[in-house]
């Protein structure tokens, strides 16, 4: 594969990550779901009756303050008016595996790092296949615009060796 194509694919990945919209209910940093390797999915978990907490084994922190610092750090996390949060890829997969991919599962596709999820197979030893299948359906435009998983892996490795 020529170097120009490798650079184009790398540039696409960078632009897709930097071009993420903020996840409105998240109060960490700039509110974008790209601040660490796992919190890449902007999902509505602050809505009443969500099954997210049940299927991920977590306790709801929505409506509480995390005191993260910065301009948003002391605001309530995933409040009812903005019930989204940058959730872990593993939590996304477990939630979908338990709930299915119906109307109960809602994502902000413009604020989700879909390409990162597409290129990931496991997160904290959790198989991400349920998340792949659901995001491919619910965030189809973003999913289809990502490089093929195999191509991304080969090109990133090749780019790093240069």
Language model features: what each stretch is:
Residues 112-162:
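Glycine- and charge-enriched low-complexity intrinsically disordered segments
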Residues 92-108:
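Short, Lys/Arg- and Gly-enriched loop/turn segments at beta-strand edges
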Residues 3-19:
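Cleavable N-terminal signal peptides of Sec/SRP-targeted secreted and luminal proteins
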Residues 16-52:
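Extended boundary segments
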Residues 63-77:
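Short alpha-helix capping/helix-loop boundary micro-motifs
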